[in-house]
UniProtKB/Swiss-Prot annotation:
<dbReference type="GO" id="GO:0005737">
    <property type="term" value="C:cytoplasm"/>
</dbReference>
<dbReference type="GO" id="GO:0019843">
    <property type="term" value="F:rRNA binding"/>
</dbReference>
<keyword id="KW-0689">Ribosomal protein</keyword>
<dbReference type="InterPro" id="IPR028909">
    <property type="entry name" value="bL21-like"/>
</dbReference>
<dbReference type="Pfam" id="PF00829">
    <property type="entry name" value="Ribosomal_L21p"/>
</dbReference>
<keyword id="KW-0699">rRNA-binding</keyword>
<comment type="similarity">
    <text>Belongs to the bacterial ribosomal protein bL21 family.</text>
</comment>
<dbReference type="InterPro" id="IPR018258">
    <property type="entry name" value="Ribosomal_bL21_CS"/>
</dbReference>
<protein>
    <recommendedName>
        <fullName>Large ribosomal subunit protein bL21</fullName>
    </recommendedName>
</protein>
<keyword id="KW-0687">Ribonucleoprotein</keyword>
<dbReference type="InterPro" id="IPR036164">
    <property type="entry name" value="bL21-like_sf"/>
</dbReference>
<dbReference type="GO" id="GO:1990904">
    <property type="term" value="C:ribonucleoprotein complex"/>
</dbReference>
<dbReference type="GO" id="GO:0006412">
    <property type="term" value="P:translation"/>
</dbReference>
<comment type="subunit">
    <text>Part of the 50S ribosomal subunit. Contacts protein L20.</text>
</comment>
<dbReference type="GO" id="GO:0005840">
    <property type="term" value="C:ribosome"/>
</dbReference>
<comment type="function">
    <text>This protein binds to 23S rRNA in the presence of protein L20.</text>
</comment>
<dbReference type="GO" id="GO:0003735">
    <property type="term" value="F:structural constituent of ribosome"/>
</dbReference>
Length: 103
């Protein structure tokens, strides 16, 4: 059984037991969270697609860790004008483990 959930403005295909890095969620490590924005649930031959959400469907997950992603380097330059600008960015993330998918 798998589901498509929306969190942090992005959509993820999840199954029970998977670990997944999502946008930062303000929750403590080893705490349970409930993802209620479930867009689709499928198991075997049965597929339920929401309009836009599947009514009553939830995904329960456990927060494993918090961290920061790889550095993205930004470099701007104007040719012949001796203008150069460097910038870097590291996005915060939360790693979660999917425990249960329920309808």
């Amino acid at each position: 059984m798998y589901a498509v959930v929306k969190t942090g403005g992005k959509q993820y295909r999840v199954a029970v037991g998977e670990k997944l890095k999502v946008e930062q969620i303000p929750a403590d490590i080893d705490s349970q969270i409930v993802l209620e924005e479930v867009l689709m649930v499928a198991g075997g031959d049965e597929v339920k697609v929401g309009t836009p959400l599947v009514a009553g469907a939830t995904v329960k997950a456990t927060v494993v860790s918090h961290g920061r992603g790889e550095k993205v380097r930004i470099f701007k330059m104007r040719r012949r004008k001796h203008y150069q600008k460097h910038q870097g960015h590291r996005q915060n993330y939360t790693e979660i483990r999917i425990d249960e998918i329920s309808l």
